[in-house]
A protein has these predicted regions:
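Short amphipathic alpha-helical segments
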Residues: 68
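Membrane-proximal loop-to-helix boundary features in eukaryotic membrane proteins
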Residues: 1-13, 19-57, 71-160
């Protein structure tokens, strides 16, 4: 029963991150459909409400997948010193590395999604520096996040 639950959790995390990635890429495509005027590195364009909604959905799913993997992965990675890290079994070291990578990918991916989504929040046209590909890069990082979350969950819940 535990193995079936673990498989379900892994599939849930992967599905949420895949949907988040697809929503991020779709948001980028919707953003590219609006009118824009570009002059060198400056750009004026209308915000896209569909891109805003898709970006918000992608960010929410990314955070939810991260929370689920961290809560269900457990908290057995408490390593307080370099000496403890060196004495820890390889499985625990790998688990800690995956945990660190999931947090880094979450920080970068969520930042990209929020910046890309925020540029579509305003009600009128805005001008400024170009914000190209933030949503699609955030979407791609959602896929990578799914891989590391599953690796973390598997290594954190497996026996040493």
């Amino acid at each position: 029963m535990v193995k079936i639950g673990g498989v379900f959790v892994c599939l849930l995390i992967v599905a949420m991150d895949i949907v988040a990635g697809i929503l991020g890429i779709e948001a980028e495509l919707e953003q590219n459909k609006v009118k824009q005027l570009r002059l060198w590195i400056f750009e004026c364009r209308e915000p896209s409400h569909p891109a805003f909604k898709l970006g918000m959905g992608a960010a929410a799913l990314l955070v939810l997948a991260h929370v689920i993997s961290n809560l269900l992965g457990g908290c057995n990675n408490c390593i307080c010193s370099q000496d403890e890290l060196q004495k820890a079994p390889p499985n625990r070291q790998l688990s800690l590395a995956c945990l660190v990578f999931t947090w880094v990918i979450l920080a970068v991916g969520l930042s990209m999604l929020v910046i890309g989504t925020w540029s579509n929040h305003k009600s009128g046209a805005s001008c400024g520096f170009t914000h190209h590909h933030f949503l699609s890069i955030g979407g791609i990082l959602c896929f990578v996040h799914g891989l590391f979350c599953v690796a973390y969950y598997i290594t954190a819940t497996s026996t040493d």
